[in-house]
Amino acid sequence: MEPILAKNPNRFVIFPIQYHDIWNMYKKAEASFWTVEEVDISKDINDWNKLTPDEKYFIKHVLAFFAASDGIVNENLAERFCIEVQITEARCFYGFQMAIENIHSEMYSLLIDTYVKDSNEKNYLFNAIETMPCVKKKADWAQKWIHDSAGYGERLIAFAAVEGIFFSGSFASIFWLKKRGLMPGLTFSNELISRDEGLHCDFACLMFKHLLYPPSEETVRSIITDAVSIEQEFLTVALPVKLIGMNCEMMKTYMEFVADRLISELGFKRIYNVTNPSDFMENISLEGKTNFFEKRVGEYQKMGVMSQEDNHFSLDVDF
């Protein structure tokens, strides 16, 4: 039995802190709290109306995936992780993560509701995990792991792959729109959400390091390569990023690069041994995600929750 999963009679009380590294992650998550009302999407409609049909199609499908995916992550937290993990510090993080995932889901739903006026199309997008095969494939993979009989360690890797791999390509595509000066509300919310998800992925890696009996390297590699294949298909075949003017081969390589960063953070050898295909994408890769958070994306962080020097993070890099 893993110590972090063993029955803990002190789980109802926070102090004294036993796992300071896990507690520090919780405090970072707490400092990142934001709400959808703080994101101004009023200027997006003008840009939306200027987009090509291909660009609109791409953005709608990405938002449809995101709108459902956060609910899947939350179902896993509620049904499995929050019940299994017995240490208070991790439960604090997971509880806060659930609140943040709700905000993400609300944000994506609001964006769809704002951009798409036809009620039938809205319903189609809101029900993407049933109506869109390309989204359903990703959703089915994630949901499979909620109910899988595998141990906590394997499922921890699977959901690190969901948040670290399934999300990264879509984040990159929205950052590409920011580079073009489009959709300020969408792109600002993307900065906040990608920061949050980076922290969630970092937390999964931290929890993995607390396991005394982690899954084998072979098992970890299998889960991650499976996720990479699904995501590559999603963004280069089912919903090709060429629709918004990005290079599909570069996106494929980027997904492999992200996977290498993730497995390296977990303490294993890289799988693909590729370099980052673009300086632009360096800003949103997994490495340094916690630092990315600390630099206060969009100059946003709760005052006084964490003491940090002011840093200015720029995404204005040639792609």
Curated annotation (Swiss-Prot):
Single biological process term from Gene Ontology: deoxyribonucleotide biosynthetic process
Single Gene Ontology MF annotation: metal ion binding
Catalytically driven reaction(s): a 2'-deoxyribonucleoside 5'-diphosphate + [thioredoxin]-disulfide + H2O = a ribonucleoside 5'-diphosphate + [thioredoxin]-dithiol
Free-text comment on the cofactor: Binds 2 iron ions per subunit.
Originating species: Variola virus (isolate Human/India/Ind3/1967) (VARV)
Entry cofactors: Fe cation
Protein name: Ribonucleoside-diphosphate reductase small chain
Function text: Ribonucleoside-diphosphate reductase holoenzyme provides the precursors necessary for viral DNA synthesis. Allows virus growth in non-dividing cells. Catalyzes the biosynthesis of deoxyribonucleotides from the corresponding ribonucleotides.
Protein origin, superkingdom: Viruses
Binding site for Fe cation 2: 101, 163, 197, 200
A Pfam family of this chain: Ribonuc_red_sm
Region of interest (Interaction with R1), ranges: 313-319
PANTHER family named in the record: RIBONUCLEOSIDE-DIPHOSPHATE REDUCTASE SMALL CHAIN, RIBONUCLEOSIDE-DIPHOSPHATE REDUCTASE SUBUNIT M2
Active site, renumbered: 108
Keyword line: Deoxyribonucleotide synthesis, Early protein, Iron, Metal-binding, Oxidoreductase
Family per record: Belongs to the ribonucleoside diphosphate reductase small chain family.
UniProt subunit comment: Interacts with RNR1/OPG080 subunit. Can interact with host RNR1 supunit.
SUPFAM superfamilies the UniProt entry points to: Ferritin-like
Sequence positions that bind Fe cation 1: 70, 101, 104
Enzyme Commission no: 1.17.4.1
